[in-house]
A protein has these predicted regions:
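A short, N-terminal "cap"/entry segment at the start of jelly-roll beta-barrel domains
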Residues: 1-52
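Short acidic (Asp/Glu) patches
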Residues: 46-57, 79-82, 99
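Short, conserved beta-strand element in jelly-roll/cupin
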Residues: 57-72, 76
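Short beta-strand His + acidic residue motifs that chelate non-heme Fe in jelly-roll/DSBH
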Residues: 72-73, 103-108, 116
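Histidine-centered metal-chelating micro-motifs
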Residues: 93-105
């Protein structure tokens, strides 16, 4: 079984040229919208050009691309294969990034918009 998991969306209604998606994450207790206006890297490289990563000790992320494309770089030493590169677009579902996972992302040339419906463990 893979270390990489997705929370898929559900189509609940379709009309001419319109699709309604349920993108709920029942576990979520926080949300943020992250907009990259170009091929941004988040977090940016440090002052000498070395890669920087986010890591959350008390938060699981559910990152869903709603516009554009974004590539995530994930490192988790508890996984069988600790290093992954995952490319997301609007059809991918929400990439689940468990707490304790180092992660960073880069948007495609035209940028991207991601909604993160996270679970903060308090």
């Amino acid at each position: 079984m893979s270390d990489i998991h997705f929370k898929k969306h559900r189509v609940f209604r379709e009309t001419e040229d319109v699709i309604f998606y349920d993108i709920s994450v029942e576990e979520s207790n926080a949300s943020d919208l992250v907009v990259h206006t170009g091929a941004a890297i988040s977090p940016p490289d440090d002052c000498v050009g070395a890669k920087s990563f986010y890591i959350h000790g008390f938060q699981d992320d559910y990152n869903r691309v709603v516009s554009g494309e974004r590539t995530f770089e994930l490192v988790n030493t508890t996984w069988r294969y600790p290093y992954h590169i995952v490319r997301l677009d609007v059809h991918s579902g929400a990439l689940i990034i468990p707490r304790g996972t180092f992660h960073r992302s880069q948007s495609g040339e035209n940028g991207s918009i991601v909604i993160n419906l996270s679970l903060i463990h308090i």
